[in-house]
Amino acid sequence: MLILLDQNGVLADFEHAFIDAWRKRHPDIEPVAFEDRKSFHIREDYAPELRGLAEAIYTAPGFIRDLPPVPGAIEAFRELLALGMDVRICSSPLMQFENYVAEKYLWVERHLGREATQRLILTRDKTLVQGDLLIDDRPVITGAARPRWRHIIYDAPYNRDQTDRPRLDWRNWRNVLAGELYRSDA
């Protein structure tokens, strides 16, 4: 089984690192709490006059490279490989890619090892990537093709209105994926 894992928000803890960076840069302005997030795009949860400040954080050199892992993500990645799954990291860089692309590779190398960089797929359109499952925090994924993979939502406050697909986090991933493996054998 080919499992595609999104990077930011699934493997790399973008959300909490953003809040920490916001507090350091703008101690006089309260950040939007993670549990209060409504939009997949973090800048859209801020007032228009604050969106440039938000964007300056996540496009800053070193931000993506220095993201901490989501708790349990590294262990789950390694366990899936040990179970014989073909696991790939499928990530969409921002349009402001100057730092993003290299830093995504550096993040993978730092947390998963240099060999894992060969498992990194960067694309603006995930529907063009083949796989059996895509675990992604983006609530709706559209593109040029009808995807072959089944979208499993990685749980986040901004995607909880989507109830038509399986949902997981790194605490319950074994149960959710066991159901998907059974389903694929049927």
From Swiss-Prot:
Keywords: Hydrolase, Magnesium, Metal-binding. Dephosphorylates the 5' and 2'(3')-phosphates of deoxyribonucleotides. One of its GO terms (molecular function) is 5'-nucleotidase activity. This is Putative 5'(3')-deoxyribonucleotidase. Belongs to the 5'(3')-deoxyribonucleotidase family. It comes from Bordetella parapertussis (strain 12822 / ATCC BAA-587 / NCTC 13253). The keyword Metal-binding applies. It comes from the Bacteria. Its cofactor is Mg(2+). SUPFAM superfamilies: HAD-like. One of its GO terms (biological process) is pyrimidine deoxyribonucleotide catabolic process. Its EC number is 3.1.3.-.
